[in-house]
């Protein structure tokens, strides 16, 4: 089983230790909703928060492309928001995206990622979570490139 498959399986099991085993001690992880995190302690906190704020996770890796230094995956992600997110409690969210894993040590099958980043249309997820279109416009406008 390769790194991407191990990551998805650990996530779907809500296995924080299994997830941490996919990353180097000093790994950088850039999450679309939770922002950037560096190092195992920060990653642990982020994953624990995710699992408090959501349930019934399903992270399906639809396509995986890899070489000796990186892996990229197209995916479909879904979950249900919990009471930890009162404005969205009980809402089911489903969206697609892509992730890039930069490998530490360069060996995909048994290696760990030193960096992770993901790309998706967060607007779709935020609408499903019940954000008003006006609020969504405000949030997304912060991402517009500046000259």
Regions of interest found by a model, annotated:
Residues 11, 27, 114-117:
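Residue-level recognition of hydrophobic positions within alpha-helical transmembrane segments
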Residues 48-147:
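A beta-strand edge to alpha-helix "cap/lid" segment located at domain peripheries
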Residues 15, 38-39, 121, 132:
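Helix N-cap and loop-to-helix transition residues
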Residues 1-22:
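Short acidic-aromatic low-complexity motifs
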């Amino acid at each position: 089983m390769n790194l991407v498959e191990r990551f998805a399986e650990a996530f779907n099991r809500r296995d924080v230790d299994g997830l941490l085993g996919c990353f180097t001690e000093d790994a950088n992880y850039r999450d679309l909703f939770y922002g950037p995190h560096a190092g195992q302690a920060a990653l642990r906190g982020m994953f624990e928060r995710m699992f408090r704020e959501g349930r019934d996770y399903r992270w399906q890796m639809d396509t995986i492309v890899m070489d000796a230094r990186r892996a990229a995956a197209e995916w479909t992600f879904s979950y249900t928001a919990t009471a930890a997110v009162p404005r969205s409690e009980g809402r089911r969210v489903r969206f697609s995206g892509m992730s890039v894993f930069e490998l530490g040590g360069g060996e995909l099958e048994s290696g760990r990622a030193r960096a992770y980043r993901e790309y998706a249309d967060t607007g779709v997820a935020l609408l499903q979570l019940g954000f008003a279109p006006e609020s969504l416009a405000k949030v997304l406008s912060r991402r517009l490139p500046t000259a």
